[in-house]
Amino acid sequence: MTIAKSRLLEVAQVGVIAGLAGGLAEVAWISIYGAISGVSVDIVAEEITRSIAPHASSSSVWVGILIHLTLAVSLGVAVAFAIRLLLLGYGRVYAEFSLVILTLTTVWGVNFLLVLPYLNPRFVDLLPYSVTLASKLLFGLVAATIFRIKRMRLVRVARHLAV
């Protein structure tokens, strides 16, 4: 395997980890909100399923969680490659966190203000916008932290090899 392919695979792997961690953080956040507010998180998962597969079976709660995590992993990989391209050689931590948070805020805006009102209006009304935005920002914070940890490990390895 060439060095370039190895680096691309490494970026994809960290994207998978960041996306999965961010997606799980969102599930945890919505679960906590549901426990406090009395909103059924099962309905949230079912509506995720209905957004993608409107005629899904009774196992739509688990399907909704699977769909959510699959989309989260895809988003994590996409953001990992965006960071790799846009911040190549730029070591400022605020730039990395800012780019990830800006990207996730944009994703939230497109989803909740453009796509979901058309695709599944019921889903948009399940939770307050502030809760869903906080969920996406939490995803961004978790993902950015993972990207930063990975970058710091690479810097340490490079310094170690240079010595």
Residue ranges and their predicted role:
Residues S6-S37:
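N-terminal signal-anchor transmembrane alpha helix
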Residues Q13-G15, R84-T106:
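Internal alpha-helical transmembrane segments of multi-pass membrane proteins
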Residues G23-L24, L102-L113:
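Aromatic-anchored segments of alpha-helical transmembrane domains
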Residues I36-S57:
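Membrane-interface interhelical connector segments
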Residues S51-L71:
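Interfacial helix-start motif at the membrane-water boundary
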Residues V73-V77, S135-I149:
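Hydrophobic cores of alpha-helical transmembrane segments in multi-pass inner/ER membrane proteins
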Residues F81, W108-P121:
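Transmembrane alpha-helical segments of integral membrane proteins
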Residues P121-A134:
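Non-cytosolic membrane-interface motifs at loop->transmembrane helix junctions
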